[in-house]
Design a protein with these regions (language model features):
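Acyl-donor (CoA/ACP) binding surface of acyl/acetyltransferases
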Residues: 1-25, 29-36, 71-220
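Residues that form generic nucleotide/phosphate-binding pockets
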Residues: 29, 40, 56-59, 63, ...
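Conserved GNAT-fold acetyl-CoA-binding loop/helix
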Residues: 38-58
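A short helix-loop-beta-strand connector motif used in the catalytic cores of GNAT acetyltransferases and
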Residues: 45-47, 58-73
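Short, charged low-complexity intrinsically disordered segments located at boundaries
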Residues: 52-63, 87-91, 152
Length: 220
């Protein structure tokens, strides 16, 4: 079931459908931000990372037409700032999807990412009919952990060696929300300052387990 990809805005932040003509800008941002993004990038354990941006965008668009994803470009004051992808969309009895994102280093600290995530999550809940939205984050990715803390995504557990990132299988913390928790929406709750403080709290046992896994994976 294909869902039309909207253009959504709040203040200086816009998320819109990614387009083939974004390929050159997307490639430039990824290359210019290699040091900033490489350690968080999903990688293919069976092949090299591809920088064929047009092919990547076509794949995202085909996935969207099949009803499995919503690929967005993120803009700040009209300037290309990053990407947000809603993926693994499942309808019916599960009604679930996953969010992934990145922004260029020069845009960090401007609340662009939480705003983009809130816009996308509210759309998925209230327009696309999703019931549950999930974000999985590497334990050492402090800026991304701050995003789920700001928006009140609930911590749901540690997933061991879950996604291949930067050349190896990495542990991830899992956070989620369900639509019943948010009658006013994610963005409004954040802007109103009513996000529960403890939602994103990670149990100490999981912090220790992730830390041990990281040391073992680094050969320490």
């Amino acid at each position: 079931m294909e869902t039309r990809i909207p253009t959504l805005r709040d203040g200086a932040v816009t998320i819109r459908p990614i387009r083939l003509r974004d390929a050159r800008q997307l490639e430039r941002e990824l290359l210019d931000n290699r040091g900033w993004l490489r350690k968080w990038e999903a990688t293919n354990p069976h092949g090299p990372l591809s920088f064929d941006m047009k092919a990547s965008i076509r794949s995202l668009q085909a996935n969207a037409r099949a009803g499995f994803g919503l690929p967005f470009a993120i803009e700040y004051n009209g300037e290309f700032a990053g990407q947000l992808n809603v993926s693994s969309i499942t309808y019916g009895s599960l009604g679930s999807a996953t969010i992934g994102y990145w922004v260029s280093e020069r845009f960090a600290g401007k609340n662009i990412t939480p705003t983009a995530v809130a816009l996308a999550t509210d759309f998925c809940f209230f327009q696309a009919g999703m019931h549950r939205m999930e974000i999985c984050i590497r334990p050492e990715n402090v800026p991304s952990l701050r995003v789920v803390e700001k928006l009140g995504f609930r911590y749901e557990g540690l997933r061991r060696r879950y996604i291949h990132i930067n050349g190896d299988w990495r542990d991830h913390y899992c956070f989620a929300l369900v639509v019943e928790e948010l009658p006013s929406g994610v963005l409004r709750r954040w802007q109103d300052g009513t996000v529960p403080d403890s939602n994103a709290t990670i149990p100490e046992a999981d912090r220790i387990a992730a830390s041990v896994s990281l040391r073992l994976g680094s050969g320490l």
